Regions:
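Bacterial N-terminal signal peptides
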Residues: 6-16
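Short hydrophobic/charged patches on amphipathic alpha-helices used for structural packing
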Residues: 82, 145-148, 194, 213
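C-terminal lobe and pocket-closing loops
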Residues: 28, 128, 142, 212-280, ...
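A ligand-binding cleft/hinge motif common to bilobed small-molecule-binding domains
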Residues: 102-111, 168, 172-177, 204-237
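Hinge/capping helix and adjacent helix->loop/strand transition within the periplasmic-binding protein
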Residues: 87-92, 107-192, 243, 253-286
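An extracytoplasmic/periplasmic, membrane-proximal ligand-sensing/linker region
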Residues: 28, 34-36, 264-325
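N-terminal (or domain-start) structured segment
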Residues: 21-119, 156-157, 166-167, 179-204, ...
C-alpha cells in the first residue's frame, strides 16, 4: 500500500513522539536525579539558611553524583524565592531552603502569592537552633527574673532591639509571655541591633544563637536564658527560660520543601539521603559550630509540624497585636 507524503510525515512524527514519551517515561522517579538539582535560598548569602543549604547541598551532590546548585533569591520577606518554588514543576529538581519565617509570614502578610499548606511538599528536615535572651551593659540585671521584674516596675523603659522577621516574632512573644511593656525597635539586621545594645542605645534582644554567638564571645553582652527545652552545649551554664521561671520556648528550624505534587518516591529518596547526611558526625559538628542541632523527620511529620507552627505564630501575632500588611 502506497502512502502519501503527508501521511508518511504524520506517521513518522507520531513514531518519534511515542519514542520520546517512552524515553521520558523510563526516566521517572526511579532515575532521579538525572540532572542538577537547584536549591533556592530566599535570603541573601551568609546567613544560617545559606550556610546550611550550601553544606547539605554539597554533601547531597556527592552522594547522588549530581550537582546541587544554590540559588539565592532574597527579597519581600522571602516570598520571592518561596513563590518561585511553589510555581515550579513538582519533579524534585527545584527545592526551597525553608525556615521558621515560612510559617510566620502568613500571620503578618495579608495576601501571600502561594498557599503555605497546599502548594508545598516536605522532603527533609535539617535542624533547629535556639534563641537566646541577651542584655547589654546598660541594663542592671543579672538573671531573667530580675529582667522581668524591672520590665514590670518600669513600663516602656526597656528597649528590645529587633531585626524584624523571626527576631521580631520571638521578641513580641517574649514581651507577651513575660507580661512586660517594652518597646521593640527595628533595625536593618542582627549586627546593627546588637551593636546598639553593646553601645547602650538599646537594652536587650531575643535572637538566634547563630546571631548572638560572636557578640557573647566579646563579653560586651551577656546571656540570661535560652529558649530551648534543654540547655545548649555551647552555653552549658546558661539556664533555659523555663528553669529561670518563665515558660518561654522559641526556636528557628530549617527544612527543604518542594512544589506540591512531587512524587512520593522522590520525596522519600531525598528524605533518606539527607537523613544519612545528618547522622554523620562531621555534619553534626558543622551544625554545632552554628549553635544548632540536626533534626530528622519524615515528610508527613514535617507537614504536621508546619501546620502546627502556622497556628502557633498566628496566635503570637494576634496576642502581640501585630498588624497584617
Amino acid at each position: 500500500m502506497k502512502l502519501s507524503l503527508a501521511t508518511s510525515v504524520v506517521l513518522l512524527l507520531a513514531s518519534a513522539a511515542g519514542a520520546h514519551a517512552a524515553e521520558k517515561a523510563t526516566k521517572g522517579p526511579g532515575d532521579y536525579p538525572s540532572r542538577p538539582i537547584r536549591v533556592i535560598v530566599p535570603q541573601a548569602p551568609g546567613g544560617s539558611n545559606d550556610i546550611f543549604a550550601r553544606y547539605i547541598g554539597g554533601q547531597l551532590g556527592e552522594r547522588l553524583g549530581k550537582t546541587v546548585v544554590i540559588d539565592n533569591r532574597p527579597g519581600a520577606e522571602g516570598m520571592i524565592g518561596t513563590d518561585t518554588v511553589a510555581k515550579a514543576a513538582p519533579d524534585g529538581y527545584t527545592l526551597l531552603m525553608t525556615s521558621t519565617a515560612f510559617v510566620q509570614n502568613p500571620a503578618v502578610i495579608k495576601k501571600l502569592p502561594y498557599d503555605p499548606i497546599k502548594d508545598f511538599d516536605w522532603p527533609a528536615m535539617l535542624g533547629r537552633g535556639s534563641v537566646v535572651i541577651v542584655v547589654g551593659p546598660s541594663l542592671p540585671v543579672n538573671n531573667l527574673k530580675e529582667l522581668v521584674a524591672l520590665g514590670k516596675a518600669k513600663p516602656n523603659y526597656i528597649t528590645m532591639a529587633s531585626a524584624g522577621g523571626f527576631m521580631h516574632f520571638v521578641s513580641a512573644m517574649f514581651r507577651s509571655q513575660a507580661g512586660i511593656d517594652a518597646t521593640i525597635a527595628l533595625y536593618k539586621g542582627g549586627a546593627p541591633a546588637l551593636t546598639d545594645i553593646m553601645g547602650g542605645h538599646a537594652h536587650m534582644a531575643v535572637a538566634t544563637m547563630v546571631t548572638v554567638n560572636p557578640y557573647l564571645k566579646s563579653g560586651k553582652i551577656k546571656a540570661l536564658a535560652v529558649g530551648s527545652p534543654k540547655r545548649l552545649s555551647v552555653l552549658p551554664d546558661i539556664p533555659t527560660a523555663a528553669e529561670a521561671g518563665l515558660p518561654y520556648e522559641a526556636s528557628i528550624w530549617w527544612a527543604w520543601s518542594t512544589a506540591a505534587g512531587t512524587p512520593a518516591p522522590i520525596l522519600n529518596k531525598l528524605n533518606t539521603e539527607i537523613a544519612e547526611i545528618l547522622k554523620l558526625p562531621e555534619t553534626q559538628k558543622r551544625f554545632a559550630a552554628e549553635a544548632a542541632e540536626v533534626e530528622i523527620k519524615k515528610p508527613a511529620e514535617i507537614k504536621e509540624m508546619v501546620k502546627a507552627d502556622l497556628v502557633k505564630w498566628d496566635k503570637v501575632a494576634r496576642d502581640a497585636k501585630m498588624q497584617k500588611q
